[in-house]
């Protein structure tokens, strides 16, 4: 089997295509959540914290010189990324919970297995021998 055929079979499997769609949707969802945090949640927090912009919070480890920029520890961006993570994790949790609920609600159809003529005959013989 040629390399191209193997790759085509791999790429056309349902799982790979589903995963690709998931990655694309996940990237778009990440942008939406980042915008929600940066443009909605953080300004509200800034309002309640005396107009502090969390993105600008940092600790200067080494002052800037003529040749090098300042070395800073940007803990404000870290706080913002934590909010991103919490919201994304919560949204994924809600989606998985909804999917699990849908899976549980699906009615389980049980197959009724009808015995063959031989099985019926053998059952009758067994029952007669028990008497």
Swiss-Prot record:
Any one GO MF annotation of this record: mechanosensitive monoatomic ion channel activity
The keyword Nucleotide-binding appears for this protein: no
Protein's cellular compartments: Cell inner membrane
GO cellular component, one term: plasma membrane
Membrane protein topology class: Multi-pass membrane protein
Residues passing through the membrane, by range: 21-41, 76-96
Keywords: Cell inner membrane, Cell membrane, Ion channel, Ion transport, Membrane, Transmembrane, Transmembrane helix, Transport
Assembly description: Homopentamer.
Function: Channel that opens in response to stretch forces in the membrane lipid bilayer. May participate in the regulation of osmotic pressure changes within the cell.
Similarity section: Belongs to the MscL family.
Protein name (Swiss-Prot/TrEMBL): Large-conductance mechanosensitive channel
Gene name tied to this protein: mscL
């Amino acid at each position: 089997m040629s390399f191209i055929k193997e790759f085509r079979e791999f790429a056309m499997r349902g799982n790979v295509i589903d995963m690709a769609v998931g990655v694309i949707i996940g990237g778009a969802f990440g942008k939406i959540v980042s915008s929600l945090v940066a443009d909605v949640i953080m300004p509200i927090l800034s309002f309640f914290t005396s107009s502090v912009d969390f993105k600008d919070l940092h600790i200067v480890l080494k002052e800037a010189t003529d040749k090098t920029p300042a070395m800073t520890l940007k803990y404000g961006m870290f706080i913002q990324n934590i909010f991103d993570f919490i919201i994304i994790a919560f949204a994924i949790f809600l989606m998985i919970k909804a999917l699990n609920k849908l899976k549980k609600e699906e009615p389980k159809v049980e197959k009724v297995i009808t015995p063959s003529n031989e099985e019926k005959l053998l059952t009758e013989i067994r029952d007669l021998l028990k008497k």
